[in-house]
Amino acid sequence: MDSVNQRDRISSLPDVVLVMILSFLSFKDNVKTSILSKRWRNICYEAKNISFKESEYVDISVFDYVSKRVSFVRYMLNWVSRVPIKVIESFEICLGFPVGFEVEIKSLIEFSISRQVKKLVLDFSSPFWDNTWDGLRNDDFVIELPALIYGLQTLESLTIYACMFDPSRFTNVGLRTLSIGWFRLEKIESLLSKFPLLESLSIISCYLDEVKLAGQIRVRELIIDNCIIPTMYCLLNLPNIEIFKYSGNVIVFDFQKVNMILLKEVYLDFFIEHENDEPTYSPKEAGDILSHLLNDLRSSRTLTVCSYLLEVISECNDPVDMLRDVQAQHLVLETLMHPNEFTGMRLLLDHCPNLETLTFQLLCLKPFPVRLQYIDSHTLWLENISSRCLRRTLKILVVRGFCNSWNEFYLLNYLVLPEHGFALERVELYLPPLQEMPRQWAYHGAAMLQKTSNRVQVILHSA
């Protein structure tokens, strides 16, 4: 009897305490508790964070995919009909291309409004779409934002993907986080004027007629991801910016103001340029543009750059003098480990005098080498060169996706040599999922690095 009481101690707690415990679980795990007992079955409906994600309930590869979607929508309606509480914190619907479910979706959104929701996520983008606006038509969007949303004063965070709305109607003065996806925006600045307290803005896969933020902008975080910008120009006045992330084609950025003290993180990804039939700019032009961009954002404490930037940054006119010192303490290089990137890597290292952590994020797996091909690291990394950060500040080297290709090995071997990495203390190697032979090759590479510099600790993390 004592053991039974011990096992059921949690169930003996008051409902209000159980609801607090459930609030620390994901919504999906919350739902699972309903099978524990009749009491738990009712308590789970008191969760203040409600999330319905099609991907967690419907497998798009099954033959009865359509009927599964119908069941999923019925499940959502049945759930909200049982919610007894009058106020919820967050409400999320992720249902791709909801043709035929317009009435049901409207009912679900109105439920969240009636519960004075603070965080609302409406994602109707299809998993079959590309991650860009290109090729989409107006009839791809079937859900229109209900009128009551525009004036909902409890709303603090709003995400709307592939949903029709009128930017001029918003009066949510308390909104602090806004994320818009798969939409055409004519003027971002006029939209932001509706939200005087906005701190975080994300624009995903949108068509942007004009990107101009020149007024009094409070935004601390700005994310622009895979958007079409026909002007190829972006004017930004961001005196409070702390986080800036951009993914897409190379465009000209004109930063009117950036607070050097506040800027914490910058992420720059132009990898899409590798996939374009014709590059947006020549390597020299792209190198000039991206050098100016790095100079404008040089005060960031964490800097992440892509393989394309590494390739073209050295193509600009007089790259050594054009690029100013970057104040980053953590540099993340998303790389294919191609020799074309190495000059750009060295250039950035030469201009990061305060660097403490260097991370290589490998973008694709390197197969086990079927024939040995010696790559002379002294050809790729000039002899007797040691950057200021290698001599003074760089303590941690991280490689994610380590496979020990020859390009990886000779680069890392150069960095851990005692005569180069004076301050280096630790190397962390993270393996991706590998078959037995490639995994053994990676183990061998880690052991060789450890032998190269006994004073540096080499740590290998298996997948």
Swiss-Prot record:
Pfam families: F-box (PF00646). Residues 7-55 form the F-box domain. It comes from Arabidopsis thaliana. InterPro entries: F-box-like_dom_sf (IPR036047), F-box_AtFBL13-like (IPR053781), F-box_dom (IPR001810), FBL13/AtMIF1-like (IPR050232), LRR_dom_sf (IPR032675). It comes from the Eukaryota. This is Putative F-box protein At3g29830.
